[in-house]
Amino acid sequence: MAALCLTVNAGNPPLEALLAVEHVKGDVSISVEEGKENLLRVSETVAFTDVNSILRYLARIATTSGLYGTNLMEHTEIDHWLEFSATKLSSCDRLTSAINELNHCLSLRTYLVGNSLTLADLCVWATLKGSAAWQEHLKQNKTLVHVKRWFGFLEAQQAFRSVGTKWDVSGNRATVAPDKKQDVGKFVELPGAEMGKVTVRFPPEASGYLHIGHAKAALLNQHYQVNFKGKLIMRFDDTNPEKEKEDFEKVILEDVAMLHIKPDQFTYTSDHFETIMKYAEKLIQEGKAYVDDTPAEQMKAEREQRTESKHRKNSVEKNLQMWEEMKKGSQFGQSCCLRAKIDMSSNNGCMRDPTLYRCKIQPHPRTGNKYNVYPTYDFACPIVDSIEGVTHALRTTEYHDRDEQFYWIIEALGIRKPYIWEYSRLNLNNTVLSKRKLTWFVNEGLVDGWDDPRFPTVRGVLRRGMTVEGLKQFIAAQGSSRSVVNMEWDKIWAFNKKVIDPVAPRYVALLKKEVVPVNVLDAQEEMKEVARHPKNPDVGLKPVWYSPKVFIEGADAETFSEGEMVTFINWGNINITKIHKNADGKITSLDAKLNLENKDYKKTTKITWLAESTHALSIPAVCVTYEHLITKPVLGKDEDFKQYINKDSKHEELMLGDPCLKDLKKGDIIQLQRRGFFICDQPYEPVSPYSCREAPCILIYIPDGHTKEMPTSGSKEKTKVEISKKETSSAPKERPAPAVSSTCATAEDSSVLYSRVAVQGDVVRELKAKKAPKEDIDAAVKQLLTLKAEYKEKTGQEYKPGNPSAAAVQTVSTKSSSNTVESTSLYNKVAAQGEVVRKLKAEKAPKAKVTEAVECLLSLKAEYKEKTGKDYVPGQPPASQNSHSNPVSNAQPAGAEKPEAKVLFDRVACQGEVVRKLKAEKASKDQVDSAVQELLQLKAQYKSLTGIEYKPVSATGAEDKDKKKKEKENKSEKQNKPQKQNDGQGKDSSKSQGSGLSSGGAGEGQGPKKQTRLGLEAKKEENLAEWYSQVITKSEMIEYYDVSGCYILRPWSYSIWESIKDFFDAEIKKLGVENCYFPIFVSQAALEKEKNHIEDFAPEVAWVTRSGKTELAEPIAIRPTSETVMYPAYAKWVQSHRDLPVRLNQWCNVVRWEFKHPQPFLRTREFLWQEGHSAFATFEEAADEVLQILELYARVYEELLAIPVVRGRKTEKEKFAGGDYTTTIEAFISASGRAIQGATSHHLGQNFSKMCEIVFEDPKTPGEKQFAYQCSWGLTTRTIGVMVMVHGDNMGLVLPPRVASVQVVVIPCGITNALSEEDREALMAKCNEYRRRLLGANIRVRVDLRDNYSPGWKFNHWELKGVPVRLEVGPRDMKSCQFVAVRRDTGEKLTIAEKEAEAKLEKVLEDIQLNLFTRASEDLKTHMVVSNTLEDFQKVLDAGKVAQIPFCGEIDCEDWIKKMTARDQDVEPGAPSMGAKSLCIPFNPLCELQPGAMCVCGKNPAKFYTLFGRSY
């Protein structure tokens, strides 16, 4: 008998039939799938739609189930109960009497009919399960005792529990509650869609196999077909006889069937050729189309140049004459095409007189030689969509430009207009979807065929183990989003894993060439049955054989040690007693002893194994693993895919398989334990009488979305221990210094290697600065790490920038004098090229010229580095030949010529390295102290032996004599440097940071001091994204976290949030608002209740689905906002007008799992905010609060953060979906030319109070209920990001004093060796005195007394952190009773008398606050203008500004503005490409709207000036 298929309408599932399926599936092959209606298909011609008919049919064909009773009397009784459940029990009026009758019948029975379960029980139970009244009785414990007992007895059984959970219709037959929250994206509600009236279509071209991109289109259309109970048309687009092949039609139909898609109608575009031709002739007669014989290339050029064709003004008669030639297929006709007469000057290329018909004389697969002219797809599609009744045409965004053409054709012909909805095309990394390119692979024999598992075809991915359900879930998760992204295949396979993991049986296979026998001396040969799946008993049992000899993986055996206890999966603990090895040290066998009584499996190694048994022979199997066919993740538009072919993409391994593998059938999916999931591609065949050989079971590996390799041996615990041991063993111990007497050849190699590492480091930095693709950066980093490892192996020490090994230095120092001359010449070239680059940047030269100059500079630097062995440093030309003494000889002081002294010298240097490494790795204090003690002892030994102190050698071989001098000069150099604002300041700072960081010499015995990258390496005006990332990390505001989109707010940034919180909290309390806290978790029911409100958040809601390893009965959401949590409580608390107003606020965190690229502060998945929610008796009270709160938000920005904002109201399109209107404050970031929403305050009207029933008795009309008026308002940590973007410069943060946690930093200067201890202590005391005095004046102050950093380093550090004022004090200042204050905002230095410290600094801080606000206000003023036309507005946008434009307020118009202002793809790289959106309708516009003014769209009168711009 053929397999049956039960189709279930998820909105109204037939529980009776589903229960019957559960009880007969052991006897009958039947599948269940979702569809539009409840239907059991028996064959192509026979199907049942009546539920009772389905039940009877299933019970009769599964005779052993006994569901239809055992005799005629029971048949009759069962029929009675089927009718009873469909009539009496389903009627609300008769429910009580029906339940009484049922209770009476069950008083002495376990089942309704006979002594076993029958259809009667299934049907009645299902009806009660779906009855809201019955469910209410159950909750209130009002049910009759016998019915309740019977209902509970059945509900506890596995089949009822399974169906009842998966298809939960409790009280509502139209609700589906899956086991857990489905991972689905947001599906747009189709405009104008009505239940039962939606018609969609899937129109593939029969020119190839369907691939996964087509599958997305088909499944999306099916989604709307099913959800709207509509109609799906499968239409073959056969408008091109050259490409159309009948063979492919059959293939596509098979592919569609594989996807379980059932179209309601099959059609061909060719069915309508006559009609389409008539429409074409109508356009010719109306002068809306013309025939053109311009050659194709010339036509293309004319369209690009917007030049009209010479035939465009032909008469209708001339056009008809040429059209007839086309229809005949004459020589002249073949050179012609029919073109629409639209607009050759249009900005949209698709509107420049597109081709409607072309002449092709090839025979058509369906119409033969009947026609010689064929319509283009773009002309035929809108006509056929209209004729066939398509209501909604779903198309990928690549057709976006053609939408205007689609609608023009509809309007020109006067036919019915379908609605077009766009969704994103599926772009997959390492994949080509072009039919032409896929055909090339097949023709070249690089793949096995169109169903090759490496292919993205439907057949290919299904053969590789993709399930239709997994594919559906993946498509559902994408939703109908328009965001075009390149996706990794891992995402698809991860969805697939969710489908196969719960049901795939577990088996074992071992790598045949590496198996090791284990002799378990006390084991007996026997067989036991164990679960095929450890967590799903429904998968069944499998036989497992045990014997005295078993086989394990060689990789596992290598991890064992004698005496170790190992867990053999499905057996128990076994002790390894002996390990036998051959002469090569390879393990040949193991001896073991059972220890099954020991049940402690927590820290043992878990391994798989197979027994040697004559009763169950191991099955030969071949595991096939496939890799991507294309090695490059994303191919450029003009790149040749053939250059990136992976010639080694298929790997096979011969395995020793589980005996159970002999029963696998083609297409069965299993999991090989500790190897992954596999699909059976070819079942095992026993020895053939023809070939005398057995055919192995071919298994194809199914990717599961993980990015790390599967563990192949040992356990996690053991692996951790092994790694720990390795790290311990590799920790620095006392070791001899690397030999100094290297050969010349070795020194030469290390020098070249050092240069190669340095050059590769520059390459990596350049790629990161350019925001190159991740794969390019990863490849460069990998090469860098390889070079570093090679360098370490060659020299015996780590690579350090600016510190080449002794061997490398030796090479440099022994170069000939001619090399020195070359080095000097190269040095001068680098310096000259640097000047060229700086000049080009200063002149704002084109990016291409700057890039070319920079590349030339990098090339010269690399050449200089290779020649000299060190980095190019401005102001440090290469030393002459005679100045480079040999560092090896220099390393030995004059009195240290003895060999033992040389060895001891090297040991001291080596131990110094150990100390530095331990400190860098933040090792424990004990370890560092121990290493330091050893270093001191070695130094003492050296002094005792040689009579002189040990002195380290610098990287160049000369002692660092000038280090103290440099440190002393650092302050004066910094002070004398002219400081400018903005660019100048940034450039100076970056230079000073670069040179100042290494100014402090090395400590004794520690060699040269390591350079640290303290300053910013990106400029705000050149690379805003990289600059922003560096500012927030280097200023210690943010620490990145291992969960994407979540960040650690360090004290430096959290203190800003505290300042905002303190101010705002105090102000709202003055208004009568109280603080509270509501739970972070939201029930699914609460969220669903307000699904319209949370629609925008739906794809971003994060769900908790498990407690430990236990699935929750119902998933729980983490709040994206708190309306759904708070308002039900409001409804309880508000009973009378006296209970109003309710004004609550909470400071909390929320989670919105955005799929967009996260940015700290600006767009994060978890963020801190305050959310206020109020309820009032009148509209006016709520409206007053909306504006009061908005003004407080404006004060936060303007008074605390020194950022000017524009106050206004959101447009209808941009307002909060659940509110009446939304007010907002908008800030502007000139560095990006974009605005950013600062905070919003919403008037919710009565929308939520109606939803949550927040009602009170009207005091004016007793007995009449009124709904409360509500408002909500929120401010987030985004404020901090805005502050960074607005005020930050190329030196780092600039903090407004009112939110700075440190307003003044005190830094002691002038501490030198010449300074006496008394003076040093006096200076420190003076610094602390300033601290006490300023704290007394309520100035937040910190003193930096760290003695391991120079003053110059500290200056840079605190400038980077944005501290408003730096207070410098030195010995001379103390004598003069004064100090120097340096402003962060301007760099201005002020000399202030000590006695005026408090008053003057308070004044300086206020001046800084005012200056920052004034500067930002001027910035906003110059970047916000009025534009009255779209053309002017576009220019304003391109200049990086925002504009107030006359606007009608219509949503369609706003969409049009956004579309028209979006940049094309060919603009300069890095420019913002998104269209402009409305920011707000300003309360105080820049100018008044003139009477009669029109909206920029030119269609409607303008209602108000509205601020538009590109936005974050």
Swiss-Prot record:
Motif 'HIGH' region, residue numbers: 204-214
Residues modified as Phosphotyrosine: Y872
Domain of life assignment: Eukaryota
Residues the entry annotates as binding L-proline: T1121, S1122, E1123, R1152, H1242
Chain intervals with Polar residues compositional bias: 808-819, 878-892
TM ranges: none
Modified sites of kind N6-malonyllysine: K300
Location(s) in or outside the cell: Cytoplasm, Cytosol; Membrane
Residue segments, region 3 X 57 AA approximate repeats: 760-956
Keyword Ligase: yes
Modification N6-acetyllysine occurs at: K300, K417, K498, K535, K542, K637, K788, K861, K1503
Location of the region described as Proline--tRNA ligase in the Swiss-Prot/TrEMBL record: 1007-1512
Residue numbers carrying Omega-N-methylarginine: R1152
Complex and partners: Homodimer. Part of the aminoacyl-tRNA synthetase multienzyme complex, also know as multisynthetase complex, that is composed of the tRNA ligases for Arg (RARS1), Asp (DARS1), Gln (QARS1), Ile (IARS1), Leu (LARS1), Lys (KARS1), Met (MARS1) the bifunctional ligase for Glu and Pro (EPRS1) and the auxiliary subunits AIMP1/p43, AIMP2/p38 and EEF1E1/p18. Forms a linear complex that contains MARS1, EEF1E1, EPRS1 and AIMP2 that is at the core of the multisubunit complex. Interacts with TARS3. Interacts with DUS2L. Component of the GAIT complex which is composed of EPRS1, RPL13A and GAPDH.
Free-text note regarding domains: The WHEP-TRS domains are involved in RNA binding.
Protein name, per record: Bifunctional glutamate/proline--tRNA ligase
Species the sequence originates in: Mus musculus (Mouse)
